[in-house]
Structure formats: C-alpha cells, structure tokens
UniProtKB/Swiss-Prot annotation:
Gene: Khdrbs3
Name listed for the protein in its UniProt record: KH domain-containing, RNA-binding, signal transduction-associated protein 3
One of the protein's GO biological processes: regulation of mRNA splicing, via spliceosome
Self-association and partners: Self-associates to form homooligomers; dimerization increases RNA affinity. Interacts with KHDRBS2/SLM-1. Interacts with KHDRBS1/SAM68; heterooligomer formation of KHDRBS family proteins may modulate RNA substrate specificity. Interacts with the splicing regulatory proteins SFRS9, SAFB and YTHDC1. Interacts with HNRPL, RBMX, p85 subunit of PI3-kinase, SERPINB5.
Ranges of biased composition (kind: Pro residues): 253-262
InterPro entries membership: BBP-like, KH_1_KHDC4/BBP-like, KH_dom, KH_dom_type_1_sf, Qua1_dom, Sam68-YY
Localization in the cell: Nucleus
Record text about domains: The proline-rich site binds the SH3 domain of the p85 subunit of PI3-kinase.
Length: 346
C-alpha cells in the first residue's frame, strides 16, 4: 500500500489543473509528509540511556497582525543577515523565517506560492520562525528553550532597544563609516587621553636625563663633591617639573609635539593613529630626545638655568666646569705643604 501511495500522489498532482491551488497545496503537503516519514506514528517515548540524537522543531509566530507596521523580518535578519546568524551560533539551532511576507519581492512570493511546489508551501502559512534542533534529548530541549528565550527579544516592537541600536552601529560600520563605530571611537578617545597625560611625563624624563651635569653647581673648596651630587638630585627633578613653564620660549633645536586632534570627529585612519602615536609619544620619545639627540636636552637645561636665576649660577659658570680638573692638583699641593714639615729633613 505504501509503495503505491507515493506514485499515485505524484500522478494526481500532474493531472490537476494549475487553477486548483488548494488541491495542489493539499497534495504537495501529503507528498512532503510521506517523503519525510511524518505520516508514520510518532514515537511517544524518549530513550535517554542510549542518548540518541533526535530532531526537534518548533514554529514561533511573528506578531505581524498585532503590529503590522513594524519590520520584524528586518530586525530578525539584521545587517546582511548577521543577527540571525549570530543567534543560530549562540543557541546551536537552525532558524528559518517562513510564511507570508518572508520574501522581499511580493510579486515573486505570490508567483512561487501559486506554483504549488513543495518547498514553497510554507508561503501559505502565517509569518513565523522555524527553529530546528538535532541533538540528544536533554540537550535538544535545552537548546530549544534557550532559542525561544533569545528570539523573544527580537519580537518586541521597539525601535530604540539595545538590539536595534547595535544593528544600526553595525550597519554604519559595514557601509564604510568606521568612524561612527564603537571600537574605533573608544580607541581614539583613549589615545587622546594618553596624549594629555603623558606630555608632563615626557618632560620629567627629560629633566631626569638632563640632570646628569649637576656637578656644575659644586661650590669651590668642598672636599667631597660626591655628596653634593646626591643633594642636587631633587633640584634636577624640580627642574623637570618646571619645564612646561619654559616651553613658551622654546630653545634652539627644540621640536614641540604636534597638537592632538579634536575629539568631535575621527578620520579614516584614526584606528592606526591611535596606536601609533600613543606608543611613539609615551615610550620612545623620551629616549630619542635624551640619547639620540643630546643637544636638545642640553640646550633645554642650559636655557632653563639661565632663565631662572642668573645671579645664583654666576659662580658656577662654564669656566669653573672646564677648570674643575685643576682643583685636584691644587688640593694635593696644599696637602703636600702640610706634609713637608715633619719630613723636611728628607
């Protein structure tokens, strides 16, 4: 009986006139059920010991009758269908939007619906989402429950919810407007903040490096100039802190950092600029200024010293620094004079 049933249905389908749309629909439904084995009695028991994979399907109605003006299909699909793809990946299910209004071209949808083909039979049903799961029984029902809970969020007719806002941002990003996307904007702002914070840090590094020639301030006659070097350390750090005040009159060879861009708009290459300038200004600018271009740091230190107080550093001029080598022989000769008295006979 079953062997003859399918050929009879196919012959009856071919004999029907295309104008009998309802008859063709019923015949196609019967053929589809027979091919899928749905005509057989369904199993009433689930064997959880064997844990065999089972197929679970559920149709979720889309409330287009209650909210006819809301585009539920667009919200479910998202930009380029990415929202529905991510929803399937998260829930580990297969989802399909079927029924009336599931196709964008209404004329083609009506044509396919009247064609009577089995794969387009769903166009006669109401608009719905078909959720299918193929997994062990416990996992299949767990996935189905998760999918029903997640898809419920997409069936709320709200234009300003989090899902809609995320889709608009993604659509802007896909259309080439990366400056309005979330990730580039956050990175661009972070780089602007680091620029404003690290500028004094760079000057501190310069002050710390230029504090090497502190021996210039060693007064005459001090027997232990090394102790003075340690006491002059905090003064050098103070100079580094006051260097931003001296930037109004930049010394020769000084190259000020470029001004940061405005935060209102972000250009096309803001993503690259965010990381490139952040590392250049924070990490390597101080080393380049102090080691690769020592003349810049020396000039900065020299101008600051003379601009702060010339009278205080008159006794520590360049002549004393160049003639500091003669201090040691003069001190030795003085010590030798004291030693000549007990050993004068030799």
């Amino acid at each position: 009986m079953e062997e003859k049933y399918l050929p009879e249905l196919m012959a009856e389908k071919d004999s029907l006139d295309p104008s009998f749309t309802h008859a063709l629909r019923l015949v196609n439904r019967e053929i589809e059920k027979f091919q899928k084995g749905e005509g057989k009695e369904e199993e009433k028991y689930i064997d959880v010991v064997i844990n065999k994979n089972m197929k679970l399907g559920q149709k979720v109605l889309i409330p287009v009758k209650q909210f006819p003006k809301f585009n539920f299909v667009g919200k479910l699909l998202g930009p380029r269908g990415n929202s529905l793809k991510r929803l399937q990946e998260e829930t580990l299910t297969k989802m399909s939007i079927l029924g009336k209004g599931s196709m964008r071209d209404k004329a083609k949808e009506e044509e396919l619906r009247k064609s009577g083909e089995a794969k387009y039979f769903h166009l006669n049903d109401d608009l719905h989402v078909l959720i299918e799961v193929f997994a062990p029984p416990a996992e299949a029902y767990a996935r189905m429950g998760h999918a029903l809970e997640e898809i419920k969020k997409f069936l709320i007719p709200d234009y300003n919810d989090e899902i809609r806002q995320a889709q608009l941002q993604e659509l802007t990003y896909l259309n080439g407007g990366s400056e309005n996307a979330d990730v580039p904007v956050v990175r661009g702002k972070s780089t602007l903040r680091t620029r404003g914070v690290t500028t004094p840090a760079i000057t501190r590094g310069r002050g710390g490096v230029t504090a090497r020639p502190v021996a210039v301030g060693v007064p005459r006659g001090t027997p232990t100039p090394r102790g003075v070097l340690s006491t002059r350390g905090p003064v050098s750090r103070g100079r580094g802190l006051l260097t931003p005040r001296a930037r109004g009159v930049p010394p020769t060879g000084y190259r000020p950092p470029p001004p940061p861009p405005t935060q209102e708009t972000y250009g096309e290459y803001d993503y690259d600029d965010g990381y490139g300038t952040a590392y250049d200004e924070q990490s390597y600018d101080s080393y380049d200024n102090s080691y690769s271009t020592p003349a810049q740091s020396a000039a900065d230190y020299y101008d600051y010293g003379h601009g702060l107080s010339e009278d205080a550093y008159d006794s520590y001029g360049q002549e004393e620094w160049t003639n500091s080598r003669h201090k040691a022989p003069s001190a030795r000769t003085a010590k030798g004079v004291y030693r000549d008295q007990p050993y004068g006979r030799y």
